[in-house]
């Protein structure tokens, strides 16, 4: 699974990625094509790199300087492939190769001067390639077929400058072009062995841009570096959703951070609409995916277990293109989790966050479907986090609920929900929205609240 495959998942992932202060568009494309990390050692290495970049990220002047250099990083993979295949490229493409080497040298020099050599790209293998493209040693970011490449070419150009006759000049210029073509061919032949090192440099520069952006984002947004869980349990202290937090604070409100733990048996969150259940689910999915790509986690503290597959099923899953209703599309999506867990050698390597499954069907069948789902995935040790309106027995899961209305304000923190504890928050929420007292009052009488 690549980042681009899940970027538009409705959990706030795009907001976090769009907030990365990347210098280069190529770096963003490189990041989008990155595969999710599933092995503990790979995830540990990713966060080790982030720690290495934190010192540089805290130096505003250094970050600005690197940003101004890395913004010119381009993807020249096509040019490198052409050279590797034995093709002769033009002057613009040769300039791109030279510019890449010079860019790498500039970045390395800046980092070494700032005592950050440990994160600098390696350009030592490309000294010979630079000499080929910069025979005069000017280190200027430009390229043409220099006189230095051929005494014959230099003499011919001098003749062209002196020649007054137009026809003679044309003949001389034709000879010049033929000589230049031969030199380009030889340059490409000479550069061919350096293509692997050039590719490596391009990727190192993109990774530097990405890792530095991750570290800067972590400091700016006060994210945390998670601990890696080896027990299968994932837990968060002070977890929040950056996108929702910004929206709430922009409206003058205050976002409530959440403490959450799951992975040791299914966890079911019950409660009314507007109770924050879906936000908890979305934030848990967001954190798991950020973890898969070695990014800062929006929480005070985080302990996260690596997963091979992550499922997030939320909202209206209606697939009009496939001719499916909301219920049918939702059932097919959830069935994908059930089948994946059946095929997996270790169900604990799967995480599933499912928002109010079977909510669009009748309560009797809906309760049966959800209870069966929790039982099946629980037996297979899937790390299941599920929200529902239905009253699911605690024998199948750990039940949590949103605290709800307290002193006229909504408390979104989670607390245990004992067996038979069905939260009655719908009318409280309705009253907080100034819904017609006639309506809510009659509903209370019907429920014998009064």
Language model features with spans:
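Charged, amphipathic alpha-helical linker segments immediately N-terminal to NTP-binding catalytic cores
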Residues: 200-245
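A general alpha-helix detector
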Residues: 49, 75, 79, 186-187, ...
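Glycine- and acidic
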Residues: 58-59, 187-192, 267-271
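Charged/polar positions within long, soluble alpha-helices
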Residues: 55, 78-85, 106-116, 131, ...
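Conserved amphipathic alpha-helical "coupling/scaffold" segments
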Residues: 1-149
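ATPase nucleotide-binding head domains, primarily ABC-like/P-loop NTPase cores
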Residues: 229-450
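Extended, charged alpha-helical coiled-coil/arm scaffolds that mediate oligomerization and mechanical coupling
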Residues: 124-209
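Active-site phosphate-binding and catalytic loops of NTP-dependent enzymes
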Residues: 84, 213-223, 291-300
């Amino acid at each position: 699974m690549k980042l681009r495959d899940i970027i538009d998942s409705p959990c706030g992932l795009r907001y976090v990625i769009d907030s990365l202060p990347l210098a280069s568009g190529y770096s963003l494309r490189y990041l989008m094509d990155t595969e999710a990390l599933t092995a503990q050692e790979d995830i540990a290495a990713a966060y080790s790199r982030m720690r290495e970049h934190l010192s540089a990220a805290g130096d505003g002047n250094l970050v600005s300087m690197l940003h101004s250099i890395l913004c010119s990083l381009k993807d020249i993979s096509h040019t490198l492939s052409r050279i590797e295949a034995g093709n002769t490229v033009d002057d613009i493409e040769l300039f791109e190769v030279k510019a890449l080497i010079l860019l790498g040298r500039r970045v390395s020099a800046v980092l070494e001067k700032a005592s950050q050599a440990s994160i600098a790209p390696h350009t030592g293998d490309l000294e010979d390639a630079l000499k080929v493209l910069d025979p005069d040693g000017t280190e200027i970011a430009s390229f043409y077929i220099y006189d230095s490449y051929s005494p014959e070419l230099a003499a011919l150009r001098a003749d062209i400058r002196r020649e007054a006759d137009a026809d003679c000049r044309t003949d001389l210029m034709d000879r010049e072009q033929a000589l230049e073509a031969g030199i380009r061919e030889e340059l490409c032949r000479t550069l061919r062995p350096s293509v692997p090192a050039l590719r490596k440099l391009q990727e190192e520069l993109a990774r530097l841009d990405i890792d530095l952006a991750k570290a800067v984002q972590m400091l700016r947004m006060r994210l945390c570096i998670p601990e890696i869980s080896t027990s299968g349990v994932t837990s968060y202290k002070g977890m929040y959703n950056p996108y929702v937090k910004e929206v709430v604070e922009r409206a003058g409100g205050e976002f409530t951070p959440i403490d959450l733990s799951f992975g040791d048996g299914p966890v079911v969150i019950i409660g009314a609409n507007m109770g924050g259940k879906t936000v908890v689910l979305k934030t848990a999915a967001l954190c798991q995916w950020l973890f898969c790509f070695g990014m800062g986690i929006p929480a005070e503290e985080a302990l996260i277990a690596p997963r091979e597959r992550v499922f997030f099923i939320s909202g209206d899953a209606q697939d009009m293109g496939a001719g499916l209703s909301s219920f049918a599309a939702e059932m097919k999506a959830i069935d994908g989790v059930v089948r994946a867990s059946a095929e997996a050698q270790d169900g604990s390597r799967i995480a599933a966050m499912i928002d109010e499954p079977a909510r669009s069907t009748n309560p009797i069948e809906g309760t049966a479907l959800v209870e069966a789902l929790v039982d099946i995935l629980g037996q297979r040790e899937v790390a299941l986090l599920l929200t529902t309106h239905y009253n699911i027995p605690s024998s199948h899961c750990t039940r949590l609920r949103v605290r709800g209305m307290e002193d006229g304000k909504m408390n979104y923190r989670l607390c245990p929900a004992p067996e038979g504890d069905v939260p009655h928050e719908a009318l409280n929420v309705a009253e907080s929205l100034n819904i017609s007292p006639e309506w809510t009052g009659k509903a209370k009488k019907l429920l014998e609240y009064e």
